């Protein structure tokens, strides 16, 4: 009889983390494929979106090879990752630039512009001021 398990994949800043877990929370396997950060200028932080996909595939292959897949029934896959990172796509859904990460600080001037244009309204509506790590200032920068 096969064990029912779940796969969790977290595409994080430092790496793609993959976990296989049983219903009771027992961890069957885990693996991390490291990712690098591209720093072109002080305060900038980028990654190549294709590297996320390559690391995910490599990690899943590692996990499957470390298990005997016929002994497991994979019930679902959960995904998370790259909150507030921006990936601009062309008309063919291909990245036009590296992903600008959540911890990138290049959008200081764009944040000032948003604050000037919205005053306190943005913070009152969203509960957040415009911050360099958020997506809207990055879109203005592009």
Task: Describe each model-derived feature in a short phrase.
Residues 1-97, 124:
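N-terminal glycine/serine-rich phosphate-binding loop of ATP-dependent small-molecule kinases
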Residues 57, 87-141:
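Glycine-rich phosphate-binding loop and adjoining helix at the ATP-binding site
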